[in-house]
């Protein structure tokens, strides 16, 4: 399977909590899209059986969340962390054989990336250091285009990783269609003029 030069590797993780020192991964899902946000494959999902101490550390909120989603019932049949890391990386390698070429994408992706860096360092190391975080665009839309923000597609993922990823891809597609300049975009001359105007307006602050 050939690699696409503009691939995005979308990853969503479900954890026992958000404390990087105590909590562990429960579920990891990967969806690969092209530059146009079209999924190249249905995606890959794996459930992990964490240490018992991590399960015992789960608070009521997280326990209820994973119970309602059905994830809690799948954990005992989950694979080891080492097996999960191997399978996740093997899946990504089908589309991204070269390291450090494809950015990680997702929603509030910093949290997922922190857990990947700790528990799946080979996966994190294979991805480009840059990330595409849909929540950044959401926050800018809230400030600059509030009507766009309030009309964004409703999310109903139920805290399962695959549904969460697909909703994040859909959300970015929405922002792209309503906020970003439509194809074919500005000409080089228009972009140069906008760049010069911006530099001039910031000249007193950026020297």
Residue ranges and their predicted role:
Residues 50-54, 60-66, 134-169:
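Active-site-proximal helix-loop-helix substrate-binding element of RNase H-like nuclease domains
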Residues 12-14, 34, 112, 133, ...:
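Acidic active-site catalytic centers that drive phospho-/nucleotidyl reactions
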Residues 124-128, 148-152, 181-187:
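Short conserved catalytic/interaction loops centered on acidic-Pro-aromatic/His motifs
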Residues 2-11, 15-104, 153, 202-207:
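Conserved non-catalytic scaffold segment of RNase H-like nuclease domains
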Residues 105-110:
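Short, well-ordered beta-to-alpha junction loops that form the rim of enzyme active sites
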Residues 92-96, 111-129:
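Substrate-recognition/cap helix-loop segment adjacent to the acidic, metal-dependent catalytic center
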Residues 155, 159-207:
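Acidic two-metal-ion nuclease catalytic site recognized across multiple nuclease folds
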Residues 65, 88, 97-100, 113-114, ...:
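HAD-like aspartate-dependent phosphatase fold
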């Amino acid at each position: 399977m050939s690699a696409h030069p503009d691939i995005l590797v979308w990853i969503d993780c479900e954890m026992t909590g958000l404390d990087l020192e105590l909590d562990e991964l429960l579920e990891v899902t990967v969806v690969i899209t092209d530059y146009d946000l079209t999924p190249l494959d249905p995606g890959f999902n794996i459930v992990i059986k964490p240490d018992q101490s991590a399960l015992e550390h789960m608070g009521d909120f997280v326990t209820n969340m994973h119970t309602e989603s059905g994830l809690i019932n799948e954990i005992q049949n989950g694979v080891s962390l080492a097996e999960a890391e191997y399978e996740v990386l093997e899946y990504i390698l089908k589309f991204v054989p070269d390291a450090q070429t494809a950015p990680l994408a997702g929603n509030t992706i910093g949290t997922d990336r922190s857990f990947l860096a700790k528990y799946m360092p080979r996966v994190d190391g294979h991805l480009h250091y840059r990330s595409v975080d849909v929540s950044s665009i959401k926050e800018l839309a809230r400030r600059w285009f509030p009507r766009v923000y309030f009309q964004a597609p409703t999310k109903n993922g139920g805290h399962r990783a695959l549904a969460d990823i697909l909703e994040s891809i859909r959300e970015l597609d929405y922002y792209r269609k309503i906020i970003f300049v439509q194809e074919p975009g500005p000409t080089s001359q228009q972009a140069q003029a906008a760049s010069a105007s911006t530099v001039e307006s910031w000249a007193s602050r950026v020297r």
